[in-house]
Design a protein with these regions (language model features):
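Conserved glycine-rich cofactor-binding loop
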Residues: 14-16
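The beta1-alpha1 cofactor-binding region of Rossmann-like NAD(H)/NADP(H)-dependent oxidoreductases
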Residues: 60-72, 104
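Substrate-binding pocket helix/loop in short-chain dehydrogenase/reductase
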Residues: 97-99, 106-108
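Active-site loop immediately N-terminal to the catalytic Tyr-X3-Lys motif
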Residues: 99-100, 149-155
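Active-site helix of classical SDR
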Residues: 122, 160
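Active-site-adjacent segment of SDR/Rossmann-fold oxidoreductases
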Residues: 133, 149, 170-180
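Residue(s) in the substrate-gating loop at a strand-loop-helix junction
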Residues: 144
Length: 192
């Protein structure tokens, strides 16, 4: 299947897995909306794409904020006309903090980005993909082997990655009748 004319949104596109994935989509011919908290890192990702940078759109985004996620999808549709793939990659962690020392704020920060952020982006992707012509698309969630083999002192991260499994399965089921597929990758240790 040709990627010509296809559009992807990649969250966490300024570093690590997100950056590599965004560059891979560009190499395959996709237009890519680069989403992340730090504009300067998104611009660096675009610059690394070389001539393909003309097919990028850097959108500073806080995936935990509904208005920011809506703005990301709106800007992407305005620039490229549609959304074919969403890679929910943005993530946070509090690894190394013993459960008994974990603050509510640390817990909430990880849940807000990893689970709520993925939900908000999935919701906007679903709305967009359901209403575009031709309809449908792919939503790919970044899971983790930590959901199955937790790292010590990683309760919030591990819990959110379990949540991603449930969200992915539910979205996959709900999306079938609209030609929206949803899957997840369980990436092991990687530089992020």
């Amino acid at each position: 299947v040709s990627a010509q004319g296809k559009v992807a949104i990649v969250t966490g596109a300024g570093t690590g897995i997100g950056k590599c994935t965004a560059l891979a989509f560009l190499e395959e011919g996709y237009a890519v909306a680069l989403a992340g908290r730090r504009a300067e890192l998104l611009e660096k990702t675009a610059a690394e794409a070389g001539p393909a940078a003309s097919r990028t759109l850097a959108v500073p985004t806080d995936v935990a904020a509904p208005s920011s996620v809506r703005a990301l999808f709106s800007a992407t549709k305005e620039r490229f006309g549609r959304v074919d793939v969403v890679f929910n990659n943005a993530g946070s962690t509090a690894i190394g903090v013993p459960l008994e020392d974990l603050t509510y704020e640390q817990w909430k920060a990880v849940v807000d980005v990893n689970l709520t952020g993925t939900f908000l982006c999935t919701q906007q992707a679903f709305r967009t993909m359901k209403s575009q012509d031709p309809r449908g698309g792919w939503i790919i969630n970044n899971g983790s082997v930590s959901a199955h083999v937790p790292t010590p002192n990683s309760a919030p991260y591990t819990a959110t990655k379990h949540g991603i499994t449930g969200l992915t399965r539910s979205t996959s089921s709900d999306g079938r009748k609209y030609d929206i597929a949803c899957g997840k990758s369980n990436i092991g240790n990687a530089e992020t």
